Amino acid sequence: MAWQNRVLRVNLTSGSCSIEALQRDWAQAYLGQRGLGSKYLAEEVDPRVDPLSPENKLIIATGPLTATTAPTGGRSSAVTKGALTGAIAASNTGGMFGAELKMAGYDLLIIEGRAEQPVYLWIRDDQVEIRPADQLWGQSVWETEPWLRRELQEPQAKIASIGRAGEVGVKFACIVNDMDRAYGRSGVGTVMGSKHLKAIAVRGTRGVKVADADRFREAVSGTMAILQPSPVRKRFTSRGTHNMMDVTNQFGSLPTRNCRDVKFEGVEAINADAVRVPRRSDGKPSLQGNKACFACPIGCGRVATIDPTSGLVNGADPQGGDRGRYKLPSGGLEYETAFAFGPMCGVDDLDAINYVNFLCNEQGM
């Protein structure tokens, strides 16, 4: 196990930040992330509270393998009373944010209360500050992340933020990290917005230590020996989770036209093969490459573009500015994104699905 044995508690109402010992018996019993975060939430939050009240808490929980070299060791969970369901919400993400929080020295981050004005949290190892975020409120995720790195003069900072969706109370708003990875379920971004917390920026330099480095390396090597030659791993590396669209369509379980059907006749225009087909306009495919989260040997993340001649990415933007930003490569389609905006809506236009995916990442929903 690689616990840091520290919990960072931030009260936005009082503006206080404190470090306390991790409840090791809870960590042992509930393992970390979703389990450990849910235990803290159940012990500290009255189940009758309004999810959007200051009495609710938002917990970012890492696990015993987070920030280690264990395969997929970069994941973390956001735990709170969910805005969408009113039940315990545990939303998991990849990317780099959870590992950075752990390397800053914290197993959990517990956020309490509500700030009077918009703020962001800056964590650099033991240095923790609550800073004004007036300039950021109303900005998108895509604007917030680069602004914070410039402001903090810390290009290696990892950032989790909300977009406009979380600010205005969209019930299914997300917390987005690394521009296109998300704590995406149950309205955890809505809870963050209700606390007037725009973003959390973290830079960790402390690293992590495991109890027995030699045995741990041995265990990781054994796991990698199974993962690397696995045909399933290879398929997800080459095709991403998008690969599941063909699988579910074949077995008659692809949600189509608001679940009135279970197969989609237009699947070949939007599946994991379609993203590799060169466009007529510029000879380039939608898929530009793949990317991996922290310590992940799978690399199922996609990087995608939209046809630069499409009307979707040209002309004036109703939200202000220029649509040209959507011509740049960004996070590509995952299976659930692809089916939800594709077959579920009866849409077989790949550019349109990518565009809506970009919008959701940008606005944090």
Model-predicted segments: where are they?
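Intrinsically disordered, low-complexity segments enriched in small residues
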Residues: 1-92, 96-365
